[in-house]
């Protein structure tokens, strides 16, 4: 874990014995996962006035020894019988990125990709 002023970083560790999970209301509408020089960015709906599940979270990050998951959540919605709901995400994968550990490093590495 690294807690910056702007970003929270959770690292996947293949030696981890205890799973880790964090959830939050993310007003920026994106979350990212860096692996080597590859960067996965997930964009999603963000409305701080909407009601979200899991104590108001619109994004959750989970990791254990095998994986790291970046999950976005839809606002709570009441559907009529037979109704439908669509939750959209936009994914992008970038190669040749350099991500440091400080908030400034992250800003520099990701700002042109958002």
Task: Please report, for each region that a protein language model flagged, where it lies by residue.
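A contiguous, surface-exposed recognition patch within enzymatic or periplasmic domains that forms
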Residues: 1-86, 101-109
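Short, hydrophobic/aromatic-enriched beta-strand segments in well-ordered soluble domains
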Residues: 83-96
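Extended, compositionally biased alpha-helical segments that mediate assembly or anchoring
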Residues: 97-101, 112-114
């Amino acid at each position: 874990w690294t807690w910056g002023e702007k970003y929270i970083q959770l690292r996947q560790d293949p030696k981890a014995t205890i799973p880790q999970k964090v959830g939050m209301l993310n007003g920026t509408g994106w979350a990212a996962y860096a692996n080597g020089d590859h960067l996965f960015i997930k964009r999603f709906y963000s409305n701080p006035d909407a009601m979200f599940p899991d104590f108001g979270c619109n994004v959750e990050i989970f990791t254990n020894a095998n994986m790291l998951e970046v999950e976005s959540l839809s606002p709570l919605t009441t559907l009529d019988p037979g109704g439908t709901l669509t939750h959209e995400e936009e994914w992008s994968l970038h190669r040749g990125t350099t991500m440091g550990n400080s908030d400034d490093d992250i800003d520099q590495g990701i700002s042109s990709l958002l």
